[in-house]
Design a protein with these regions (language model features):
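Class II aminoacyl-tRNA synthetase-like tRNA-binding/catalytic domains
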Residues: 3-198
Length: 198
C-alpha cells in the first residue's frame, strides 16, 4: 500500500552523503536496488540518480511496524527513509562512493510497490535489446543511461546559458516534418475558412 509524502522532504541525494554527514539526521528517497533480510536486521541498498547508499533497519530503531515494512521491501520499491548517518561498523565497500557510511533508519514510508522487474536494473546488463526497448521506462533507470541523460541535460543547459550571455535570443520556430501516424490515420481537421474542406 502506497503511503503519503505529506510533511516529508528529501534532505539530500544518496551519493551526496559522506563521512562529513556522520551524526546528521537525513531523509533520502529512491528505488530499492537490493534488500537483504538477515533475521533481526535488514540491509537495503537505496538508489537514486546520484548513486547508492546502504540503509540498516533494526526493530529497536524503527519499531515493529517499520521493521515489518523493511522486511517486505523488494527490488524497485520506491521508499522514503529518515535516519542517522553513521560510519559503517562492518567492512567498507570500496565499490561505492558512500561505501564507508550507512544510514540507520528510524522511519520508512513505502511510496510505491513494484512487481519484480523483467531484468535487473544495473550497469552492464546482458539483457537483450528487444526486452530493454519493451520496458524502456525501466531501462532508463540504469546508471549508464542515467549518466548519458544527465550529461545531455548539462550540455544543453550550458549551451543555452552561453548563448544567452552572448546576447542571443532563443526563438522556438515551427518544425516542418512529415507526419508519422505509425499505423493510425491522420486526424482530418475541418477548415474554418473554406467550408467543406479539410
Amino acid at each position: 500500500m502506497a503511503e503519503s509524502m505529506r510533511g516529508l522532504k528529501r534532505t539530500c541525494r544518496c551519493a551526496e552523503l559522506s563521512a562529513a554527514n556522520v551524526g546528521q539526521t537525513v531523509t533520502v528517497m529512491g528505488w530499492v536496488q537490493k534488500s537483504r533480510n538477515k533475521g533481526g536486521i535488514v540491509f537495503v541498498d537505496l538508489r537514486d540518480r546520484s548513486g547508492i547508499i546502504q540503509l540498516i533497519f533494526e526493530e529497536s530503531n524503527t519499531g515493529a511496524e517499520g521493521f515489518e515494512k523493511a522486511a517486505k521491501l523488494r527490488s524497485e520499491f520506491v521508499v522514503a527513509v529518515t535516519g542517522e548517518v553513521t560510519k559503517r561498523s562492518g567492512a567498507v565497500n570500496e565499490n561505492l562512493e558512500t561505501g564507508d557510511i550507512e544510514v540507520v533508519a528510524k522511519d520508512i514510508r513505502i511510496l510505491s510497490e513494484s512487481e519484480t522487474p523483467p531484468f535487473p536494473i544495473e550497469e552492464n546488463s546482458k539483457t537483450k535489446d528487444d526486452l530493454r526497448l519493451k520496458y524502456r521506462y525501466l531501462d532508463l533507470r540504469r546508471p549508464d543511461l542515467q549518466r548519458n541523460l544527465i550529461l545531455r541535460s548539462r550540455v544543453a543547459t550550458l549551451t543555452r546559458q552561453f548563448l544567452a550571455e552572448e546576447g542571443f535570443l532563443e526563438i522556438e520556430t515551427p518544425i516542418l516534418n512529415k507526419s508519422t501516424p505509425e499505423g493510425a490515420r491522420d486526424y482530418l481537421v475541418p477548415s474554418r475558412i473554406y467550408p467543406g474542406s479539410f
